[in-house]
């Protein structure tokens, strides 16, 4: 029996090592993931009209998006809202038509968009947005508008791109200390295109802008034929950065103008997003991978030592005992065989959390597969969030199945009650936090507030699809025969001896969460930067590697600590296995708090509440995901070792 256990343990460890090695090799060359465009390419002939769209105003200081036309910019005769998917609405996107008129490959200079005379209210609105460093986001042919910024990186010049341009800027006139607000009222657009030599048709591969603040002047009365003296296409006078800036004050007249330049590019349409997705910190990601792999190898060595040496020796010794007296003299994990599968306290709640963890695990895994295949690229705006929501809903089937299977193993009979709690506990907590945050956003009149129609759609996804699927999964899982325990449970619980200080439940649980968090914290930095500093994150190959390492780390650290716990004759492993790996969520939230105070510039109370509210939801989801991994690892481990020894 011992040799059979040894062989099975070796096979498991070898297959696990091969699996990790195979995954690593699969992604070592394509860690960025490849890109499948979210839309079909569109060809433009010379003179074709190009439709520019405006999106939300964004700020990393407030994290509150606003509609472009919430400020008194020049408007088209009729504002038309673009159709948006669920993810776009939840992100606060508000895509609308713009008054800009572009003709393909026809340069324009100093086009007058319109003029606005500021009153006290509009001047205050512009000043507030400038002070909060809001950026204007636009879209052309599904490409976001970027501002090119030249910088010197390691002695060589390079260009980085920032999404959107600032509404304005703050500064002082020469010789004055009084701070003034200036408006970016002239935009110099550059549209880059790739031309087909055979057909002469062109495809757009870049959309850039350089914003200027200029106090436009003109002679005579204002009319449709007015020519500006500060920017005149007839005299080829261009706007320059040294021009007198346009101040934002009450009763000031602001004239909005723009240039359009077209530049041919060697970049092909299929590669046009490379500029936006180009990452210059690959070395840091690889360091993260290597760092995490070192943790995995260390834990794998410990697990191998336990399973291939200690357990083999223990099982051989236990199986060779001749008398009951000799067995009673032994100490260690075998002594608790009659209690190790005793029903845990709050077993119903454990079933619910395990089912929810399976739902989270399935959602994350499938989402990453789609992301690596390119279906959730940034060109598919809102696609990532939409996919995660829909996958969460449909993974309810597996949540119900997992919770009811465990519930039946615990000899439960009321599977409908478990299915109900599985369908409602986690979503109810998340929804309560979400509704409070949404109310705060509504109070700020931000476009980030979820409309009632979208709210109804979310409720329908929950009650109309997710809940029934949880019950279907629960029914299927409960109908299957329960897994038998490898050993019988004694009627009278065994007394647990006094434990050493390092085996204290709270201490061991907190220690157990450090390594899983250590495996992901570097990648977590880039994810937080992407979310809260308005940058692209599209390195799902790296992320998938880290995710696999996280799974292995959670499983191994929990198994190691579970073994030490059983050797101390403490058989209350059910909840502790869940909390050991799940405690990594506590470190995630603490790191998010550290990130808030060291990297973000948020000053408003509402914005801070939004940040910590969303990070609380993320930490809660991380808790159930990692906790479930640790629980199943320990369940497999205990069933394996106790099925491999002779029990009299």
Swiss-Prot record:
Motif stretch (Endoplasmic reticulum export signal): 637-642
Positions of short motif Golgi retention signal: 646-648
Keyword flag Signal: yes
Stretch forming the signal peptide: 1-33
Keyword Transmembrane helix: yes
Lumenal face residues: 34-285, 377-381, 444-455, 528-538, 599-604
Subcellular location per the Swiss-Prot or TrEMBL entry: Endosome membrane; Golgi apparatus membrane
Membrane topology: Multi-pass membrane protein
Pfam families xref list: EMP70
Cytoplasmic membrane side: 307-355, 403-422, 477-506, 560-577, 626-648
Keyword field: Endosome, Golgi apparatus, Membrane, Signal, Transmembrane, Transmembrane helix
Main location: membrane
TM helices/strands, residue ranges: 286-306, 356-376, 382-402, 423-443, 456-476, 507-527, 539-559, 578-598, 605-625
InterPro entries: EMP70, MFS_trans_sf
GO CC terms, sorted: endosome; endosome membrane; Golgi apparatus; Golgi medial cisterna; Golgi membrane; plant-type cell wall; plant-type vacuole; trans-Golgi network
Family indicated by similarity: Belongs to the nonaspanin (TM9SF) (TC 9.A.2) family.
Domain notes per entry: The C-terminal KXD/E motif functions as a Golgi retention signal, certainly through the binding to the COP1 coatomer.
PANTHER family (UniProt xref): TRANSMEMBRANE 9 SUPERFAMILY MEMBER 8-RELATED, TRANSMEMBRANE 9 SUPERFAMILY PROTEIN
Protein name: Transmembrane 9 superfamily member 8
